[in-house]
Amino acid sequence: MKGSFLISSNSSEIDRNIFANKSSLILQWLLVIGIEKEQFSIREVAKECNLSLGLAQRVFKMLTLKGYVHVEGLRTSKKFRLKKPEALLKTWLDNYNIVEKCKMWTYRSAFQNKEQIFQTLIKNNLEKKVILALHSAAEAYGYKNTNLNTIELYILQSDLRLKIEEKLLLEPQEKGYDILLIEPYYKSILNSFSQSCKLSTKINLLCSPILLTYLDLHNFPLRGKEQAEFMAERIEKLKKIYKKTR
């Protein structure tokens, strides 16, 4: 069984810029952790993001040139601080659109409710191989602002899609969806920063990190921006940036 392929990126190559997959770990760190620090070093960021020092240096060079971070000192004694978090976030939003960057498949399901679907994932040992995304992640964090009853899932391994289709009794759907499967662009962020969300006493699933959920929703056509703004006005991690970005 094959799902309905929604849209794909126009290029198979990873963009070689600060918004690429691995580089995004640094942006995530800056906007969530670095924003709380008076100063930090490139070596510190590279270590915490598990990236090579060379990649971190290239990303910081670009961030400095664009004025997002401020640098003090020389050579190995350089220290940085995040100078323009709101501008960095806005530029990231301008350069990332989940619909353009990710492959998506839309389905209807024979199951009657979300709990049955989540329990089926757990029963088939798939709960650590999918990640709640978009509106599903917003709901899991307790910040749902729509009446949508859809499920959006990142799939960490593309070869698992057919198994998920089979176990969840999925049928392709051309317009709208009950379930949306997504092959992620920002795999590095998901692997490093996804959080465990307790949906009920028996259901515990991984959720897309709050910042990535916001980025994903902002340009998502199905009531995404509305949901993103609702979250940004209420979640402290986002409020620090968003209040200056609107």
Please tell me what each predicted stretch does.
Residues 36-49:
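Short acidic, hydrophobic short linear motifs in intrinsically disordered regions
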